[in-house]
Swiss-Prot record:
Role of this protein: Necessary for normal cell division and for the maintenance of normal septation.
Species whose genome carries this gene: Halalkalibacterium halodurans (strain ATCC BAA-125 / DSM 18197 / FERM 7344 / JCM 9153 / C-125) (Bacillus halodurans)
Binding site for Mg(2+): S37, T59
TM region positions: none
GO cellular component, one term: cytosol
Protein name in the entry: Probable GTP-binding protein EngB
Binding locations of GTP: 30-37, 57-61, 75-78, 142-145, 174-176
Pfam family, one: MMR_HSR1
Domain EngB-type G: 22-194
Origin: domain of life: Bacteria
Cofactor(s) annotated in UniProt: Mg(2+)
Keyword field: Cell cycle, Cell division, GTP-binding, Magnesium, Metal-binding, Nucleotide-binding, Septation
BP terms from Gene Ontology: division septum assembly
Amino acid sequence: MKVTKAELDCVAVKPEQYPNSPLPEVALAGRSNVGKSSFINKMINRKKLARTSQRPGKTQTLNFYNINDILHFVDVPGYGFAKVSKKDREAWGRMIETYLQQRGQLKAVLQIIDIRHDPTKDDQLMYDWLKHFEIPVIIIATKCDKIPKGKWPKHVKNIASVLEKDGGDPIVIFSSETGVGKDEAWKAILHAIS
C-alpha cells in the first residue's frame, strides 16, 4: 500500500481521550524495545513519525496514527519491562486492557516478536489473552535481517509452537531495516480491516 498520509492523531490514556473516529484500528503489542515504533516507521516510509528509543519503556500512552484516512495504527506501551514501578506497570496494564477489551474499532492486534528468540512468557500471556477475548492476531516476526534467511522457517516454527498458535493467525517475517515482509504485512492488515 502506498502511504500518502501518516500523522499522529491523538495520544490517550483513558477512553474519553480516544479519537472520535469511525476508522478501523490495528494495535501493535510487543515486549518493550522489540521494535514497534520502527515497524510503524518502516510501514509508512517515514524515519521518525513514531519515536524510537534505545531505552525500554519509552511509549507510555496509546498513540493513534492516522494512515491514509483508512485506519489507525495504535502503538501501545511495551510489556515485560522491569525498570518501572509496579504501580506504573499496573496502570499501563489497566490502560491497555481497557483499550483492547472495549474499543469497537479494534480489528486486529499486530503482536511484534523478535524472530531470533523464542517468545517470552509475556509474549505467551499476551497471545493467550488476545485469543481468550477473540481478538484477531497477526504475528510480526521482526528483525529477520539479523539471522540467515535459511534459518527463518525454523524460527517461525518455534514461534508458532511456543505460542501454540491458532491456525488462522498469520506469521509475517519482517525487517524494519530492509523492508522484507512489508507488502505481506500490509496485505494481512488490509484483510483484517476489510
